[in-house]
Amino acid sequence: MRKSRDRVEQFPRPLSSIESKEGLRLDSGLGEMNRVLGGGIMKGSVALIAGEPGIGKSTLMLQLAAGIRSEGRVLYISGEESPVQIRLRADRLGVRDSRIEVFSETELSAMLRACGKLKPIVVILDSIQTVHSEDIGSVPGTVNQIKLCAQELIDWAKSHGAALFLVGHVTKEGYIAGPKVIEHMVDTVLYFDSGSAEIRILHCAKNRFGSVDEIGIFEMGEQGLRQVENPAAVFLSQRVGEQPPGVAVAPMYEGSRILLVEIQSLVVPAKGGISRVFSERIDSARVSRMAAVLEKHLKVRLSDQDIYVNVGGGIRISEVGVDLPLCLSLYSARINQPIPPLTAIVGEISLAAEVHPVGHLDRRIRAVQEMGFSRLISPPPKEQKLQVPEFCYPVSSLTEAARTGFQT
């Protein structure tokens, strides 16, 4: 492999001699982006942001370029749009920042020369699939081109202390097309997903400088992406009338905040007598496990049923507190009886159908109360000092939860 162009030569030095201020973060100007990154953009870091074509990655990157709270320059390199197209999109978004340098280019050496001349604090490349090097005998988008071009850009960013954002496209199957091969080379991997028609969710799959549990929530509008002011309720359906069977509301702990989400279940007779589980937003193994617990302890037959599970708004749920609302959602769908309105449910379920405590119960109680719910079915609090309000119904078993859950 060739030596990277314009690379600053580095030498070993004692760990104790390195000042922590060398790792200062930049304020992106987007609170949700700062949250997901762990407090802002780390200087010298490299982030891969992936999503389906048309989801809004370019819009997010242009708004990030305009929002960065720093005096330095931002270099926005596009291999897919001309400068005029970028300007038209910037006008629509209300972006008018002289610090943003726009460069329409796909050749690696030209990009590195521009970086060396401008010395930007942040470089945005949209997208990595379009980059090619004349020294590599293959077309843009191939594994060799992506891997070697990315390495050159990463070397430059690391040696000059500039933050680098690489945009990549995701296939229909949800995989990063091409850039999957550089995930191990970058510091952060971000996915930009569509929650609903307007909602966009930014979540982290890898982060060397922060948690991978945080998510950012945006709303897409005519003027671009807007940060959601009340994310706790953004995933709840605004329905009129009675809640249908199979729907359970759960206060889930995502990153550092509580989100109220709808667990939606549909249970129908299996075709051909073979039961199947269809679930994208909750792990299918968890759904199968909860179905087995239900069949064993509540005596409802599910082994001859097809089970469909969804989470309203498109958010993915992995925390254990989803067990109890998932069980009651499945039970509600199977007996075709709705859970009473304004009821929220949370709790972990063991294979013995015991309801185990969950973390941050006090914050979940507060979030449910603020959203106007009249009942919360939950495990007993782990903290003995926690005062449980009257609208909370502590349960210790799945049988007790089912009995309590369907009381009006």
Feature names for model-found ranges:
Residues 74-78:
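Conserved RecA-like ASCE P-loop NTPase motor core of nucleic-acid helicases/translocases
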Residues 1-37, 42-48, 55-62, 66, ...:
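Peripheral, non-AAA+ core regions of ATP-driven protein-machinery
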